[in-house]
């Protein structure tokens, strides 16, 4: 069947993911291969000192992204999308979206980037004897309670961004287990919210007199492959303003960007892992057993089918690096040289590999925003050197590439060196890996492990959630998600692997020691520069 026939017969599957700077739609065929795509650029706003996206921006962004997909389908195949076999919605995890019983949002969406929840996260971590990160939805909820925010009494439903969009498209208040594990801890045995912690939380807030308990307002947890409702007539109109798309399409459980990244890199099996490196970064290692104790810098989440995952999440990754590359672009424009950004990135990234393995002593702190792993509530991007360091372009670029995964290294060193976690394969995806071989080599040095990158890595989470849509409608009886991906999607494709060199690993270790010692400078900058 051709792509055109797949679309016209309603066999195509749609995946849409809301990233922090881009909303992306991918249409796949029965072979699970992308056949069309659309996108929409967007940015978060800092309103009253909190990072947010407006409800209007969410819907206009979704509609523009879908319209862009329709345009691509029209241009490539000269047809319209009338029916679909399945739809999947995914988005940035965590954060706070609270609604009243009239479906009105009570306060502007508070995204994962907000680090104003320190008191709540610390109290809950102590209560649960479990690391509860600042950005988790339960931290945001409890912080609003601690702040005495009036809206809390009116909460009828609290969810994530993916859960919100799914609810509006289907009427179902559900969430995939992976995304739910970023709201509050999941019990891997029941694949549901940890019942003991739910009970403790309800006890903690009992004296405050709210008319709800936690399970009244949190979404129902679903596993990959479970029915999560169908596109309603109103939902179809909200997605496709042209009116071509028909209602009744089944949707898979909405997932978080961590889960879709695992799917897109075939890393849902135990002893596999993946690293997503873009505006923010995270590593996900699927564990064989629980860690021996909670660590503040390691979050425990799950795969979309409920296996336990150790996640190291960093708020900052490539934004500062991109800002420096942009500076070189401006210099090029000043000289009157035509600018091709792919060429600028390619030249600078590859030149970085000619620098010293330890960056010649140069250090970069890429903290556009706060970084909980290193204990910073706010960030100040900073480049530091001593007068006698080897200051040249290669070392300069290399230090910024190292910085993009430096915090990730600090967290993963605990997993590999202290918890002795074993991994057979780690796959990289995201913007850092666009320039062939460079980001891969840097990450391999950082975590002293071979890194694979697949050709499909650039498809990212939108393709991952489309695959979860495919799993909903195309999996065999009792076929696990790992088997479905292995047999029907990747079929032996493990991508291109780069192993770390001893020199790179030793150099990165020196760099990270300098980096840790210099954190006092970053802290001083946060405290003194406004």
List the model feature ranges, each with a label:
Residues 1-108, 122, 154, 215, ...:
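N-terminal glycine/serine-rich phosphate-binding loop of ATP-dependent small-molecule kinases
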Residues 2-8, 14-15, 81, 119-175, ...:
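Active-site core segments that coordinate phosphate-bearing ligands/cofactors
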Residues 20-22, 111, 133, 298:
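Intrinsically disordered, low-complexity sequence elements enriched in Ser/Thr/Gly/Pro
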Residues 39, 111, 497:
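Conserved beta-strand positions that form and line the central face of beta-propeller blades
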Residues 74-111, 131-133, 166-178, 182-187, ...:
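Short beta-strand-loop/turn "lid" adjacent to the catalytic site in phosphate-handling enzymes
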Residues 114:
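Carbohydrate-associated surface elements
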């Amino acid at each position: 069947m051709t792509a055109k026939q797949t679309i016209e017969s309603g066999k195509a599957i749609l995946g849409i993911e809301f990233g922090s700077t881009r909303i992306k739609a991918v249409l796949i065929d029965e072979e699970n291969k992308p056949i069309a795509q659309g996108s929409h650029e967007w940015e978060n706003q800092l309103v009253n000192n909190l990072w947010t996206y407006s409800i209007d921006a969410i819907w206009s962004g979704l509609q523009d992204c879908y319209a862009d997909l329709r345009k691509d389908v029209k241009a490539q195949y000269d047809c319209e999308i009338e029916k679909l076999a399945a739809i999947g919605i995914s988005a940035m995890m965590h954060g706070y979206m609270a609604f009243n019983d009239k479906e009105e949002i009570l306060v502007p969406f508070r995204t994962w980037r907000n680090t104003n929840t320190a008191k709540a996260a610390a109290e809950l971590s102590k209560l649960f004897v479990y690391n509860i990160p600042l950005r988790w939805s339960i931290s945001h909820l409890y912080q609003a309670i601690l702040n005495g925010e009036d809206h809390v009494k009116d909460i009828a439903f609290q969810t994530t961004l993916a859960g919100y969009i799914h609810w509006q498209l289907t009427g179902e208040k559900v969430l995939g287990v992976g995304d739910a594990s970023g709201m509050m801890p999941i019990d891997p045995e029941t694949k549901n919210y940890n019942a003991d912690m739910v009970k403790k939380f309800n006890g903690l807030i009992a004296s405050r007199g709210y008319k709800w308990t936690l399970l009244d307002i949190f979404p129902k947890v679903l596993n990959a492959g479970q029915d999560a409702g169908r596109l309603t007539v109103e939902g179809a109109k909200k997605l496709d303003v042209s009116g071509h798309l028909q209602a009744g399409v089944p949707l898979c459980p909405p997932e978080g960007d961590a889960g879709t990244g695992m799917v897109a890199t075939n890393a849902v099996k135990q002893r596999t892992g993946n690293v997503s490196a873009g505006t923010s970064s995270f590593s996900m290692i699927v564990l064989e057993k629980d860690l021996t104790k909670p660590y503040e810098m390691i979050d425990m989440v799950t795969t979309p089918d409920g296996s336990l995952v150790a996640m190291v999440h960093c708020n900052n990754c490539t934004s500062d690096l991109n800002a420096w590359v942009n500076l070189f672009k401006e210099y090029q424009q000043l000289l009157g040289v035509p600018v091709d950004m792919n060429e600028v990135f390619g030249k600078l990234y590859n030149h970085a590999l000619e620098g010293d393995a330890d960056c010649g002593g140069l250090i970069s702190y890429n903290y556009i925003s706060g970084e909980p792993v290193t204990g910073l509530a706010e960030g100040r991007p900073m480049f530091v050197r001593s007068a006698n360091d080897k200051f040249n372009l290669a070392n300069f670029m290399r230090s910024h590439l190292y910085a993009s995964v430096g915090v990730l290294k600090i967290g993963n060193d605990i997993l590999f060196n202290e918890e002795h976690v074993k991994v057979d394969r780690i796959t990289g995806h995201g913007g850092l890996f666009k320039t062939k071989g460079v980001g891969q080599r840097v990450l391999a040095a950082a975590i002293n492990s071979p890194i694979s990158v697949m050709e499909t890595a650039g498809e990212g989470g939108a393709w991952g959630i489309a695959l979860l849509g495919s799993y909903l409608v195309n999996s065999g009886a009792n076929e696990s998600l790992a088997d479905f991906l292995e047999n029907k999607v990747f079929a032996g494709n493990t991508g291109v692997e780069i192993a770390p060199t001893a020199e790179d690993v030793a150099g990165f270790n020196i760099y990270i020691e300098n980096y840790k010692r210099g954190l006092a400078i970053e802290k001083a900058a946060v405290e003194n520069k406004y």
